[in-house]
């Protein structure tokens, strides 16, 4: 790691602070200083994040890790713009995201390789179901939640997905537009912010990404169509020859993705309840819980039927 000293101008960015520093040889460079949010340790494993960053950086993903301190880290600066939600569905960009995601999923991170989805969901559930709010209106809304029902939904979905034999990969788990950057001049795409990264089910990572097509307004009518999904799948499964992907492989990944998409809604719904209690950010996290959980219930019947029909098919199909 290079020694740097002296801080010049700094500018707050969406993913941290851009800081100009002068090296010992007099050269001025830009770096990014990321500060962890208060109470984020309740939902993020920082030790796991730091371990992953080193290996992912070596594989060409994200910014280089330059140093760590008590409540944050220093990384190299990426000269690129953050994508918008509409950017992600543009065919050329969707294909590039798919190709990069395949490569991301091939990175080997040492350590515990068990998928973390259901461990995390049940951990979140345990915390989310025992909260108390000082704000009486928040407490009233919170008490309208049937955690018995939520737990039953988690158990049913976990059982269904267990039959899909989804590959376990090192997953980003939070591939929204804000964690994708593009250098338009070089046409280079970057994945950033691996704080939720872990070994997980492939379909969860892709389904979670598709949920983010809804954008910051959470308009789930923008969820990608089957045609858009197949375009993504072709470039994910066969980056060099996407048109040669078989219909069988496309349908298998379609079922896998759209079943685990439901798990994405449950994951972030329970996460939101913890944030409603712990986060100092002025955001309606309770409202976000209901938004995600209601979307889960809206999509559940069709997605369960899709998976059950697929699993019941003759094995030679």
Show which residues each predicted segment covers.
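Short amphipathic alpha-helical segments and their helix-coil junctions
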Residues: 188-191, 233-255
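Helical subdomain adjoining the active site within ATP-dependent kinase catalytic cores
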Residues: 245-317
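A general structural signal marking secondary-structure boundaries and capping sites
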Residues: 5-8, 101, 105-109, 132, ...
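Hydrophobic core segments within long, regular secondary-structure runs in both alpha-
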Residues: 151-155, 229-234, 290-297
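Active-site activation/catalytic loop segments of kinase-like enzymes and analogous catalytic loops
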Residues: 203-245, 262-280
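Juxta-kinase regulatory segment immediately upstream of eukaryotic protein kinase catalytic domains
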Residues: 1-21
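ATP-binding pocket architecture of kinase catalytic cores
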Residues: 22-149, 156, 160-167, 185-186
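Active-site acidic catalytic loop and adjacent metal/ATP-binding pocket
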Residues: 14, 18, 23-33, 152-210, ...
